[in-house]
Amino acid sequence: MNMLTALLVNITLSMLLIIVAFWLPQLNLYTEKANPYECGFDPMGSARLPFSMKFFLVAITFLLFDLEIALLLPLPWAIQMYNIDIMMLTAFILVSVLALGLAYEWLQKGLEWTE
């Protein structure tokens, strides 16, 4: 199976699932289904509390650097390859882009909790 066939099959299945999801109505939507579930007890308060934007920015930054580690973990195995220069250049570019992003976030005071 060549790459084009696999791509077409994946796109077709994805579009089919999206179309079916939009065409099917939301059946039996009532207030009990829309309420949050807290271990069988009635909720003590509202579950729709506002989310801290500062925490969100720190969490996204953490996820980006976690992704960096996940992408750099195969580096020791890549060193065993014949073309080490391309792998090291790619790793350097990845770390540089993320370091520039962190520096920009730091200069914009996006990581500080106090206003």
Curated annotation (Swiss-Prot):
Question: What keywords are assigned to this protein?
Answer: Electron transport, Membrane, Mitochondrion, Mitochondrion inner membrane, NAD, Respiratory chain, Translocase, Transmembrane, Transmembrane helix, Transport, Ubiquinone
Tell me what topology the record assigns in the membrane.
Multi-pass membrane protein
- Presence of the UniProt keyword 4Fe-4S in the record: no
User: Does the entry feature the keyword Transport, yes or no?
Assistant: yes
What PANTHER family has UniProt attached to this entry? NADH-UBIQUINONE OXIDOREDUCTASE CHAIN 3
Could you tell me what this protein does? Core subunit of the mitochondrial membrane respiratory chain NADH dehydrogenase (Complex I) which catalyzes electron transfer from NADH through the respiratory chain, using ubiquinone as an electron acceptor. Essential for the catalytic activity of complex I.
Question: What is said about its interaction partners and assembly?
Answer: Core subunit of respiratory chain NADH dehydrogenase (Complex I) which is composed of 45 different subunits. Interacts with TMEM186. Interacts with TMEM242.
Q: What is this protein called?
A: NADH-ubiquinone oxidoreductase chain 3
Protein source organism: Peromyscus maniculatus
Q: Give the classification, highest ranks.
A: Eukaryota, Metazoa, Chordata, Craniata, Vertebrata
